[in-house]
Amino acid sequence: MLPAILAFCGFYVAGSNQQMFNDATQVVLMRQGTRTVLSMQNNYKGPPEAFALVVPVPSVLHEGDVKTLTKDVFAHVEQMGAPRLVEYWEQDPCHPEPPMEIQFAGGAGVAAMPVRKMAGADLGVKIEAQFTVGEYQIVILSAKDSSGLETWLHQEKYNIPEGAEPLLRPYVESGMKFFVAKVDPQKVKFEDGRAALSPIRFFYDSDRFELPIRLGLANSSGTQDLIVNILAGDRYEVANYPNVTIPTNLDVTPMVKDKFPAFYAALFDRTVEQHPGAVVTEYSWAAGSCDPCPGPTLQPGDFATLGADVTKENLGYGYVLTRLHARYGKDIKDDLVFKAAQPIVGGREIKNATGQLDNEAKPASQNNFQGRYAIRYPWTGPITCDKPQRGIWGGPPAGQTQQGPQAATGLAFAPRGQVQLAQALAKPDQAKFGGGAFSGS
């Protein structure tokens, strides 16, 4: 079965014997120097009893390191980095406009938490800090033994997912701390049976830039997907797994207009089938610009919300937004480790030396890579000149309205099996593509 969920770097534990699953998490990492700011928006599917989030962190976090956010910034980031669908019309071959690239317009307060007497010392567990942020009751734990940590969580009435102790062990042995954010369901709104939790952000300093995903396997029933957005001065890729880029500049048939998320899901599935174990780069672009733009660009206020207010230097419009998409199962061995990479370009309406559009990423002087897919409408009017110039694309004929680029958002819930690539691609031979295997490594 293909995954219909997005995983996260921690696991969720419920205060009942029912399993708590995470089915859609958005993660945004801001990185500058040794500082990492991690922001996440969680959707939960489970009973409304007390539940918690457990995430390994490299150091003890304090009240000022944690805050809640509003949800709109995550929708903004997702829209900017998402694959986009555009429409082009062939211009009058006898009166073409000069060829050019087409552009489109496009915390809660913190309160003290009562201290409870626990037998943590006997279990090798120490409460390093505890505080409340919004609906989150947070404790920062250190542990000398993974079994002791598991026992402590059991004593606190949490039903740890089966198989959690071996997953906790490497983090305990490496000296990691544990961010445990318990949620008070009386402070949470439930919409259609789903908890609408406030996004949460915290930051820390570490020489290593990584995301601990192995602990999330405790909630996994099989294969999981994870989308990570990184805001930094450079493009980023993973250092410990293969890197590929999503095939781009593919022309599609008009039927894709109503099934774009399903089309992209099929394209991504084909890509990971051809490159098992690889992490897919779906977007890498200056965060303050885009072309085509599916919506407003990210603004200084967005950067501040996502961490620029706690980094040494606010890069303003100098941030690069990188979107990485990973698929993994229970056999994954290592967390995702990130490294800076050279700029790439791809997914633009710029022809190469052979007069074709490249379907793969290429090295470049600046980051301009996106997953871009186009519906093209050939010229159907009269041709009244001796030397028509075909293949010049632009906006629609006079009097016809053009919709802006369509972004494939909400891919955690994109339907699978509705689109066959061979029928969706305007050039069926592209269904055999092996492209996208660019790596700056």
Residue ranges and their predicted role:
Residues 13-31, 113-126:
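Short, compositionally biased low-complexity segments enriched in polar/charged residues
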Residues 30-90, 149-170, 175:
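Surface-exposed, glycine/proline- and aromatic-rich loop segments on solvent-exposed faces
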Residues 2-8:
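Sec/Tat signal peptide C-region and signal peptidase I cleavage site
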